[in-house]
């Protein structure tokens, strides 16, 4: 089974695009840092491709973060929801 097919039932979400923006890295710069094509970074960000464990670890090393901070099986909470919690039902 291909990784994308497995991903239909077990998705892998990531924060690569957000982290790239925070670190002011282009797709090309991140691709060069982890030794892959720029198109691979785009496919990862869109969820069209899932990284090997080795690639996931190389990406995490670039950002200095543990793997669970960059990749997860459940969707990440939007940063805006963490920074600006909903005030519904509050006076």
Question: PLM features: residue spans?
Answer:
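A short, Lys/Arg-rich alpha-helix, primarily the initiator
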Residues: 1-22
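Short, charged recognition helix plus adjacent turn
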Residues: 2, 6, 61, 71-91
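Generic structural marker for isolated residues within well-ordered, non-membrane alpha-helices
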Residues: 16, 27, 56
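Alpha-helical residues within the helix-turn-helix
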Residues: 21, 32, 61
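Residue-level detection of the helix-turn-helix DNA-binding "recognition helix"
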Residues: 21, 35, 46, 75
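Short alpha-helical DNA-recognition segment
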Residues: 24-43
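The DNA-contacting recognition helix of HTH DNA-binding domains
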Residues: 27, 38, 48-49, 67
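DNA major-groove recognition helix of helix-turn-helix/homeodomain DNA-binding modules
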Residues: 54-69
């Amino acid at each position: 089974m291909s990784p994308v097919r497995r991903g239909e039932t077990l998705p892998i979400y990531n924060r690569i695009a957000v982290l790239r923006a925070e670190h002011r890295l282009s797709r090309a710069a991140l691709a060069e840092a982890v030794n892959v094509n720029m198109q691979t970074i785009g496919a990862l960000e869109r969820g069209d491709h899932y990284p090997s464990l080795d690639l996931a670890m190389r990406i995490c090393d670039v950002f200095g973060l543990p793997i669970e901070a960059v990749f997860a099986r459940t969707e990440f909470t939007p940063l805006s929801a963490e920074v600006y919690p909903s005030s519904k039902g509050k006076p």
